[in-house]
């Protein structure tokens, strides 16, 4: 996956705010890349565009050598549901549903029958260490457990790419380290590509590459 000349502007107060300013980036299959930079520099915007949650003002994203945004709205929805998993700083779990029901949801939205997705969801929750917590609602789980549910949910439709926006930002250092260990294990065992926006330098250093954003562009790579 790659970005070429990405520009993203937002209308604000009768004017325009430029967030991305001609950003170029390559993301190779199977690698784990950290995006770092000050708040407001465009990290979340970049992830939203890579995940087809938002469109660039100019520029293009190539996925399998095809221009992603040449797809129809239905094609973009299919891409989001089948090819990409999302993990956010705040887990965005549905509070009225159990952990298991939250993990099942992407499969149901993808058109699968509950009987076909239930076993897969249970296996994912067991994999992330929540075998005994499947029937608990989010309010009955710790912050680290909630994020584990969110990771299981992101894996439900077997994505090639996971976009994680500050996935450890709301956790203490111990829980953050455990969550990163889990993401790394998934990356290595399943070959899932990760693009992770983070302020945590210690976690970023454990990834394959780090890219630093300044003024809406990639300013440095390590």
Regions found by a protein language model. Give the residues of each.
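ABC family nucleotide-binding domain
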Residues: 1-214
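Conserved switch/coupling elements of ABC/ABC-like ATPase nucleotide-binding domains
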Residues: 215-221
